[in-house]
Every structure is written in C-alpha cells, then in structure tokens.
C-alpha cells in the first residue's frame, strides 16, 4: 500500500496571512500535512488559529520550534521587519523556510520618527541590500529550501499564461500589473516604521513579483539571460487634498508613506513592465497582469472575475458571507468570489511548496524572486 509522505509545519505569526496559509495547507493533495505548531507573541491569537485550523499546539516563543526535530518547515507570516532574522535562524536550525511577502525592508532606527520623510532612500536601499545579502549567504550554504509566498505567481491565469508563453517561446514586449484596493485595516499600514513603505511595499510587490516571474519563464524558454536594467517610480500621497469628510469612505491613513505608486521596469532586452498600486480604489480589490508579446495578448484577471455575479436587495443572512475583499456592502450587483483561495493562488502556492519539500523540487517562487522584488521596490 502506498504511504503518503508527511510534511510537518511550524507557523510563526497568527494574523491574516496565517489563515490564508493554513487554509492552503489543508487543501494540499498527495501528501500528509501535519500542522503541528502555531506561534505568536499574542498567545490568545495563536490559540484561535490553532482551534480554527487544527494545529496541535500554540506557543509564544518561536525558538521552541527551531529545536523541534519533527518540524520540517518554518512558515513565516510575521510583519516583514522580522523576516530576515527569523529566516536565518530557521535555516541555520536545518529547517526549510516559507516567507511571506515582502522579503524585507527598511524600518528605521530605534526611536526614529517619520522614517519615510526623513531617511534618504539611498540609505534605505543600502541597508536592505545588506540584510538581503546576509540572508542570501545563509540560503546558499544551508542546503534547505527558501520559498517566497508570492501568490500572484500561482494564480491560475498567470500559471496558464506562463504555459502558453513557454510553448510558443513568445517574446514579452510589455506587461502591466496592478494590485489596488481601499487602504488597509492594519494600524501599521500608514507608518513606514511598521511596514517598510507604503502601497508599493505592501501591495505593489505582488504584480512586480508576478511579472518578474513571467519574464523569467520567457528567458528559460528562449534560452536567454534577461535582467532588470532600470527602475523608474512615480509615488505620492493623493489623499492630502481631501478634507476629513471627504475621507469617510477610504481606509487609507498615510503618515509618512505613499498611497499611490507607478513603477516602470526596463529589462536588458529593452522590454517594459508597469506595476500600479493605489490605496484609493473603491469597489473591491483590483488584481491583474496583462501580458503583450510578439504574438499574443494575455489578460490575467485575478480579482475580480465574473464567474459569479450576484445581486441582492438586502444583506439579510449574509453577515458571515464575504462577497469579495474590501466590499463593505453586499447589495446590488457584485462580482462575488468563487473559491478565492484557489483563484488568488494560495492553494497552488502551498501545493508547490509542499511538493518541493517532499520530492526535493525547485519551487516556482524562491529566493531569487524575493530578492529581486525587494531590490526593485527600494531601487
């Protein structure tokens, strides 16, 4: 009788991303996934995730997981200022690592105020590169896998587009990607010290990562070496012009970060990619990558899609039904989520990561993509 391989998980962080990952782990096929330990400094939050998704235990000290011989992989879903330190410790303890986006950033020195307004971007870039190079050395010497949780890579339309591009050996000439929404519910989102940047750091990294990956697929299919040669960004705070009453529908509260970003990436073959992100888009999150090549046009709609369009006269009975992300009202016409964990790429992401560990495969989204994305964000 065939016995499935087992991969044992230890997760650090019990916030929103922990739920996305735990749900993805539960959907992995062909392997036994053991959710052993969930850790958070807020033990009550860890206990909630434990009870909701079936982890065996909840703890408040993540170093306990590093010494647990049963745990194969450390899943890091903490705020990004902790990513590099925790990843290095986990790799040195012989664990594989899954790291949420973004890989890292600059968060200021202790006691530093208004980091985004006062610290030169050249200083930020230098510090970020130093931290990433330190982590890179550990990744390369550890013999363990580093998996970068960029769900755009695993969104079914993006994966399907990559398959077609590889088959035709198409030359991508221009890509446009976006992740825009109505602000953030996190109190740290408006502070550079809390997130390492604004909308570009929080959300713009998604289309950047997805488009970099697609360009890598082209390069492999065509036997070419393609790198990024130029990054030009236009960022700003578009909501400064609003009176308090004009902000009543917006969640965005920037203090020393941008709420809009527009980044143009130029590759060594002269082709372009445009990444857009805004904190001021009402009507639900906008997630897509459009690819225009020498012989094709591929429109990858991630959210919203039109698989299910809903119309409700009232909200009765829908209190626990989520229509889509950042859609407060459920009445009228909406493009409702259908199996959003799969459509947005989380299911495929965790399946690929678990297969990579169990069968010693190279993950689609690994350290090089994490490194290049962060380097572009801080360029």
What are the functions of these language-model segments?
Residues 1-53:
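N-terminal Rossmann-like dinucleotide-binding module
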Residues 1-3, 73-75, 141-144, 352-379:
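C-terminal helix-rich "cap/oligomerization" subdomain common to oxidoreductases
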Residues 73, 84-150:
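Beta-strand-loop-alpha-helix segment that lines the small-molecule cofactor/substrate pocket
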Residues 77-81:
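N-terminal glycine-rich "phosphate-gripper" loop used for MgATP/nucleotide binding
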Residues 142, 149, 155-187:
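Rossmann-like NAD(P)H-binding beta-loop-alpha module
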Residues 151, 240-254, 290-368:
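C-terminal glycine/acidic-rich active-site capping loop/insertion
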Residues 186-272, 277-284, 368, 372:
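Rossmann-like dinucleotide-binding domain that binds NAD(P)(H)
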């Amino acid at each position: 009788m065939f016995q499935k391989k087992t991969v044992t998980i230890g997760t650090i962080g019990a916030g929103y991303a922990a739920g996305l990952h735990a749900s993805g782990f539960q959907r992995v096929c062909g392997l036994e996934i053991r959710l052993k330990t969930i850790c958070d400094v807020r033990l009550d939050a860890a206990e909630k995730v434990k009870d909701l998704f079936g982890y065996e235990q909840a703890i408040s000290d993540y170093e306990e997981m590093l010494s647990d011989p049963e745990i194969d992989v450390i899943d890091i879903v903490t705020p990004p200022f902790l990513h590099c330190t925790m990843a290095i410790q986990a790799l040195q303890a012989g664990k594989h690592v899954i790291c949420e986006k973004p890989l890292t950033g600059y968060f200021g020195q202790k006691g530093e105020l208004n980091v985004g307004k006062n610290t030169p971007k050249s200083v930020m870039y230098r510090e970020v590169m130093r931290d990433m190079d330190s982590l890179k050395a550990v990744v390369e010497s550890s013999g363990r896998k580093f998996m970068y949780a960029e769900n755009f890579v695993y969104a079914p339309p993006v994966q399907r587009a990559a398959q077609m591009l590889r088959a035709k050996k198409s030359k991508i000439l221009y890509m446009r990607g976006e992740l825009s929404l109505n602000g953030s519910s996190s109190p740290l989102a408006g502070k550079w010290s809390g997130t390492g940047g604004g909308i570009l750091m929080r959300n713009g990294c998604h289309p950047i990562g997805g488009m970099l990956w697609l360009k890598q697929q082209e390069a492999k299919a065509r036997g070419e070496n393609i790198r990024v040669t130029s990054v030009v960004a236009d960022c700003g705070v578009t909501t400064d012009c609003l009176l308090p009453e004009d902000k009543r529908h917006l969640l965005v509260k920037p203090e020393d970060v941008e709420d809009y970003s527009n980044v143009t990436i130029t590759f060594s073959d002269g082709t372009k990619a445009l990444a857009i992100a805004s904190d001021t888009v009402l009507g639900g999150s906008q997630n897509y990558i459009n690819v225009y090549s020498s012989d094709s046009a591929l429109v990858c709609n991630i959210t919203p899609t039109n698989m299910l369009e809903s119309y409700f006269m009232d909200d009765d009975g829908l209190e626990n039904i989520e229509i889509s992300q950042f859609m407060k009202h459920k009445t009228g016409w909406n493009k409702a989520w259908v199996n959003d964990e799969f459509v947005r790429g989380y299911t495929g992401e965790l399946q690929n990561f678990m297969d990579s560990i169990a069968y010693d495969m190279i993950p689609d989204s690994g350290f090089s993509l994490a490194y290049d994305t962060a380097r572009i964000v801080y360029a």
